[in-house]
Amino acid sequence: VSEVLESYAQGSWFTPTDEGSPLADANTGETVARISKNGPDVAGMVEYARTVGGPALRELTFHQRANILKELAKHLMGYKDEFYALSHRTGATARDTMVDVDGGFGTLFSFSSKGRRELPNAKVILDGPLEQLSKGGTFVAQHVYTSRPGVAVQINAFNFPVWGMLEKLAPAFIAGLPSIVKPAGQTSYLTVAVVKRMVESGLLPEGSLQLLVGSHRGLLDDLGPQDIVGFTGSASTGTILRNHPNVVSGGVQLNVEADSLNCSILGPDVKPEDPEFDLYVKQVVTEMTVKAGQKCTAIRRVIVPTSMAEAVTEALIGRLSKVKVGAADNPDVRMGALVSQDQREEVRKAVKALRTSSELVFGDPERVEVTGADAESGAFMSPILLRAEPGAKEPHDVEAFGPVSTIITYDTVGEAVELAARGQGSLVGSLVTNDEDVAREVVLGTAPWHGRILVLNRDDAKESTGHGSPLPVLVHGGPGRAGGGEELGGVRGVKHHMQRTAIQGSPDMLTAITGHWTTGSRRAIGDVHPFRKDLTELRIGDTIASAERTVTRADIDHFAEFTGDTFYAHTDEEAAAANPLFGGIVAHGYLVVSLAAGLFVDPAPGPVLANFGVDHLRFLTPVKEDAVIKVTLTAKQITPRTNADYGEVRWDAVVTDQNDEAVATYDVLTLVAKGDE
């Protein structure tokens, strides 16, 4: 008897006492593992996440959490062979497995990088600029993101047992939210194998990850307003979750990513001899056959000009006829099995419904020639290509979650846009065209109905990641039928798991709360130049108030001649006098910034290693000849790097003139040594 899959709950592995039900190898029908409906104490798991996992994560900064994800991905990479072998048993070929396993690990690496590069080494994220709420500047506001004291529950689909878990885990983890993972039963044995390697790594804070295998009945019953549920699956199950009392009235945040009727449009400019024609045909066949079409982003609707329908149909048939279907671990096989024979029956039913208004032009839903396996024992199915009758409704309503696509024709670009919208909301759409006007009309017309749109042509094809590939840095989700949710998107995905709050108060209070110097807060001007302080000595608010410098006409003339910037406002007195903004010769803005640097820089070698940029530079008041300027430089944000002997310091710079008017404001970015801790 095969082993019964275990759950990981409250810090230990839970083994069901019953034999459970068999999970079949998609290729052979043999039992891979068994799954029980009897799981651990769900309420206890939720409480453990809140009281153990959450506090442990929130003790860490964003950078520390991100570094854990990086090390975790490196650890998992060492077990790829183990995961690949199990993935093949789900029906996934090597190409399919790369999308799931390698794609999952790549998502961890990507979020780790984003977290370390775009978030502070802190526990609070500032959102947007400071809002001035009073004339005197004593009452201000700042939007911030903070970590929720809740739990992220993920309910995943069967098609991506690795990527589906990790793409939800990564942003939640960086946000400081512990996760409870509920994998789909059919492929849960692969998820269990990955989680076991994650737990044994010792990298994850206790309680930050738990795994619930089997029935998820009651999973939402103990959730509340600080908790988030991320669901991937069918629209019907999504509707059931939306109607749960804790979602309807209990404040539980639900993010739904549902399967959708994604389309790919062939532009009216494309002819059979164009590179875009081959790109289109190849893309459709790829999306039909990767994961045997069991992808929420697969192309279900092939929207082509009526004049090109025959050519596209013939080309698709030519490519599909070369696709070998069979055992996932056979190197000659292009398309593997569906996840189960039950799933194959579901696809066959959907194909039958589609055929009420569409002609079958390739494939046979009932039989297929199989390589390296038995067609009856495994869950194999032929790729199916249909061609819809004019005005057919079924292709826009019925989804066959398998290797099935339907050709739909259009006569005008406006009609193509309308057909795309009839899907009632999709995760992704694509357009293959080399006409910029067509691209503009189609993309702007279909964007409200899509979470992502790919425009493919000869220029980007070589480096394109393809129609069906969600990327960690781009949002994944879609309106309407696609669930109305949104995930991934780099730091956007992290913030989705946090709470945004507007904090009002005095500048000093906001500085104390956020750990970020706020305009109007106290400044500390001491005897030691801030550039002589390493990160262990430097404090938020440390300031240098510079000496003064007169900007002479000779300075302006020299800068113009030396740099070649001879714009008339700096060189032509008559023209400059006629300018309504200047009324005479003015100094270059970059001259003012350069002179300011000369006023605040401490030149000798010291803790400051480099200036690596300037942010938010604004020139506010023209500086005329003989103006007297000075600069105030204040340590605004200190971000130690966790894996380096230096960190980043952001300085608030304000250049003022003899009338104490601000002439320039900006942030100076420096790298500063940590020193001895």
In which residue ranges do the predicted regions lie?
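N-terminal Rossmann-like NAD(P)+-binding subdomain of aldehyde/semialdehyde dehydrogenases
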Residues: V1-G137, K322, V339
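Hydrophobic beta-strand-centered segment that forms part of the acyl-chain substrate-binding groove
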Residues: A578-A587, L591-Q637
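Catalytic strand-loop segment that frames the active site of acyl-thioester-processing enzymes
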Residues: D527-A587, K674
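HotDog/MaoC-like acyl-thioester-processing domains
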Residues: P530-I540, V623-E677
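C-terminal core of ALDH-fold dehydrogenases
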Residues: E366-S382, V413-G505
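Rossmann-like NAD(P) dinucleotide-binding subdomain of oxidoreductase/dehydrogenase enzymes
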Residues: L119-D278, D332, Y410, E463, ...
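Short, well-ordered beta-strand elements within core beta-sheets of diverse protein domains
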Residues: T31-N38, G54-R58, Q132-L133, V153-Q154, ...
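ALDH superfamily catalytic-core signature
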Residues: R197-G202, I228, T237-G391, T412-G414, ...
